[in-house]
Amino acid sequence: MRNDWTFKEAKQIFNLPLLELLYKAQTIHRKYFDPNKIQISMLLNIKTGNCPENCGYCSQSSHYKTDLQKEPLVDIDTLISEAKKAKELGSTRFCMGAAWRSPLDKDLKIVCQMIEEVKKLGLETCVTLGFLKEHQIAMLKKAGLDFYNHNMNTSPEFYEHIATTHTFDDRLATLKAVRKFGIKLCSGGIIGLGETIDDRISMLLLLATLEEQPESVPINRFVKVAGTPLNPQSDIDPFDFVRIIALTRILMPKSYIRLAAGREQMSDELQTLCFMGGANSIFYGGRLLTTDGPQPEQDDLLFQKIGLEKVQTICH
C-alpha cells in the first residue's frame, strides 16, 4: 500500500474515462473487501450548537443564526438507549459528536463514560470533539476509544474560505496527535463548498500520504443550511462525485469509504455508482448530526435491490 502518491498521478487517475476508473477502483476494492457487504455506522449529536468556530457550512456555529435548537451534553441513560437502538438496526459502530472547539476535562470525563458504556454493548466507538490536548487523548485511549473523527474538509489552499477561527494545520496536528496514541482515524471531507476539482484531489492526497492512512474516510456532499454563509453557485456534478469516491478507493485501498452527509439528495442510482467506485460504508438512521438522511427502510430497500448485506461483525 502506497503513501507516496503525487498530485500528478492522482489527477491522471481522476481524469480516466469513467468506466475505466470505476473498473480500476472496483478491482482494488475486491482485493480488500467483500463487494457485497456494507458497514453501517450511526451518529448521535451528544452536544448540539453554540460552537465558537466559524465554519461557514455548519449550523452549529454560534456565529450564525440558524433554526438549530441548542442542547447540552446528553445524559448517559439517553446515550445508552440510542446506542442499543443503533445495534438493533445493524450498526457496528456508534459515533458521538459534540459541538466544541475543544472539550473541557469535566465534560470529557462524561464522554469517556459514554465510550465505556457503548463498548459494553459490543459496538465500536468513534467520537468527534474538536481539538484535543495530549492528556485528553490519553483519557480517550484509556476509555477504550476505537476511532477519532476529525475531518480535513477541504484542501489547505481553500481552507481559509470555509473557516478563519482555526487553520488547516490545526486540524492536521490533531490527526497526528491522536495517531500517536494508537487510536484509529476517521477523516475525510466535504464536496461542493465552492472548491475546485484540484482542491478535492489535494485534500484526498493529504490523507493518502499520511504515514498511516485513515481507517475510515467519510465523504460528505455539501448540504446548504439556511443562515450559514456558504452558498456555492453551482451544484455538484454527480459524475465528479463518483470520480472522487473512486479516486479515494484507489489512493486508500484498505480504508472504509463512507457516504456521509448529502445522501438524502442522492438518487439510488448515484449511490450505487458510488458503491461500484469503492464506497462500502454509510451513516444510517435518518439523521446525521443536524442534517437529514434517508430513513432506515429506504436504505434497506436499496440494499435489497442491489444485493448489499450489512456487515455483521466489528470492522477493524
From Swiss-Prot:
The keyword S-adenosyl-L-methionine applies. Signal peptide: none annotated. Binds 1 [4Fe-4S] cluster. The cluster is coordinated with 3 cysteines and an exchangeable S-adenosyl-L-methionine. SMART domains: BATS, Elp3. One of its GO terms (biological process) is biotin biosynthetic process. Pathway: Cofactor biosynthesis; biotin biosynthesis; biotin from 7,8-diaminononanoate: step 2/2. Its EC number is 2.8.1.6. Keywords: 2Fe-2S, 4Fe-4S, Biotin biosynthesis, Iron, Iron-sulfur, Metal-binding, S-adenosyl-L-methionine, Transferase. [4Fe-4S] cluster binds at C51, C55, C58. Its cofactor is [4Fe-4S] cluster; [2Fe-2S] cluster. Residues 36-260 form the Radical SAM core domain. It comes from the Bacteria. GO terms for molecular function: 2 iron, 2 sulfur cluster binding; 4 iron, 4 sulfur cluster binding; biotin synthase activity; iron ion binding. Belongs to the radical SAM superfamily. Biotin synthase family. Homodimer. Catalyzes the conversion of dethiobiotin (DTB) to biotin by the insertion of a sulfur atom into dethiobiotin via a radical-based mechanism. HAMAP family: BioB. This is Biotin synthase. The gene is bioB.
